[in-house]
């Protein structure tokens, strides 16, 4: 997710910046109080809702991806967090997701998110072992896995793409070899664990910047190394490249041009889309179709999310919240969150060759402490906040200064007590809808 770097700055500058991207283009769902139900005709998943209304989205394919990044779950469970379905039954959270129409899980992988003493950097301490835990549970519940390699020891986004500690000082040829070997070894571990790998993402929000490199010839070489390893270990998996900032006209077309110029082998051009940063739905569609139509690639919305409340639930500032970040027509409410998700899905379904949508960290809730001090202890011990103090050695200018809790707990699809929100039902309701036109 783009934005942890700028959580504090965004809060301070919101009154200036948010007016630029406040409208998403439409809001097709409305709230109604009568009980209604919907069935996902592709999976026979049936849900009902007393409060939520979701308008049907046309032209959703049977294999449309309703995905969820759920990378932080093991670290939260280590804090004592439990998850509950809509009937207050405690369950494996991945089972709850599957029961509500989610068919794909996305998990990020950092090479070595620990200091020399074994203290985790936070953000879920998302190494390969964490990915195996997540992947096994996804597969056990009938969901495929998107493996998201950052090729860093911590968050990689448009502003920072630090190479792993072990790769610092390497030449580009050495780094490409390291990417190839690391990707291959990691995917083999996942495959050997019986995990159903459907897609492999080579880099995260690589906007002309990846693993410390800013030259497109070098970036393309790194991507090609990751793609080659993927083809060898997971020949049936789709290779995904991920970018951000679709609000910038022709930016994606420029990236796709460079990828084509350097012959990078990939299948899917992925975009982040957060309405409070990334402009309108119409622009998102336009920019992605410049890639799918010109280069014959598939597209996917790899990240999106929206707030169900303005409340901060863990004593750490949120990316959006009270007084800032609301997109026009989408209040911070469970219905508002559902409307946003429904309309992102509708946009994806309208884009040429778009595979689907992944909601970002919809399971990342507060660590469970009753005070900031209690939460801080949990964040430091289990890595359940966005960054721990231990990351200062690796990321001194961002994580080292602004470490703390979750900045997106109010954008989860579970409440602060771990109970599934009604908005989680959107995935199952959206094929048929439960709202009369």
Map each language-model feature to its residues.
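C-terminal motif of bacterial Sec signal peptides marking the signal peptidase cleavage site
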Residues: 20-23
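Active-site cleft segment of glycoside hydrolase catalytic domains centered on the general acid/base Glu
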Residues: 120, 126-130, 156-260, 264, ...
């Amino acid at each position: 997710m783009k934005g942890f770097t700028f959580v504090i700055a965004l809060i301070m500058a919101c009154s200036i910046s948010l007016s630029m991207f406040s409208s998403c283009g439409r809001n097709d769902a409305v709230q109604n109080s009568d009980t209604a139900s919907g069935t996902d005709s592709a999976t026979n998943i049936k849900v009902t809702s007393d409060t939520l209304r979701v308008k049907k989205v046309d032209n959703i394919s049977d294999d449309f991806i309703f995905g969820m990044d759920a990378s932080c779950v093991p670290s939260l469970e280590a804090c004592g967090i439990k998850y509950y379905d809509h009937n207050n039954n405690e369950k494996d959270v991945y089972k709850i997701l599957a029961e509500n129409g989610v068919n794909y899980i996305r998990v990020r992988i950092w090479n070595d998110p620990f200091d020399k003493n074994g203290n985790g950097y936070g953000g879920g301490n998302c190494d390969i072992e964490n990915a195996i835990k997540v992947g096994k549970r996804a597969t056990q519940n009938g969901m495929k896995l998107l493996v998201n390699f950052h090729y860093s020891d911590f968050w990689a986004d448009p502003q920072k793409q630090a190479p792993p500690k072990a790769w610092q000082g390497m030449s580009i040829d050495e780094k490409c070899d390291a990417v190839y070997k690391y990707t291959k070894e990691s995917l083999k571990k996942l495959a050997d664990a019986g995990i159903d790998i459907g897609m492999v993402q080579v880099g995260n929000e690589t906007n002309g910047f990846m693993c410390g490199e800013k030259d497109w010839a070098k970036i393309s070489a790194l991507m090609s190394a990751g793609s080659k390893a993927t083809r060898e270990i997971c020949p049936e998996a789709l290779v995904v490249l991920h970018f951000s900032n679709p609000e910038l006209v022709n930016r994606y077309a420029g990236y796709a041009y460079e990828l084509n110029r350097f012959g990078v082998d990939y299948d899917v051009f992925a975009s982040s889309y957060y309405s409070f940063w990334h402009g309108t739905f119409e622009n998102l569609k336009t920019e992605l179709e410049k890639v799918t139509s010109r280069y014959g690639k598939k597209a996917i919305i790899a990240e999106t999310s929206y707030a169900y409340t303005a409340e901060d639930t863990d004593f750490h500032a949120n990316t959006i919240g009270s007084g800032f970040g609301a997109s026009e027509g989408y209040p911070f409410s469970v219905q508002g969150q559902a409307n946003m998700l429904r309309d992102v899905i509708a946009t994806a379904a309208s884009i040429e060759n778009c595979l689907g949508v992944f909601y970002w960290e919809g399971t990342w809730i507060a660590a469970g402490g009753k005070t900031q001090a209690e939460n801080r202890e949990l964040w430091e011990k289990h890595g359940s906040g966005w960054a721990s103090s231990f990351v200062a050695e690796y990321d001194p200018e961002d994580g080292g200064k602004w470490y703390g809790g979750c900045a997106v707990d109010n954008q989860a699809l579970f409440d602060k007590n771990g109970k599934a929100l009604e908005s989680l039902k959107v995935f199952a309701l959206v094929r048929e809808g439960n709202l009369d036109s």
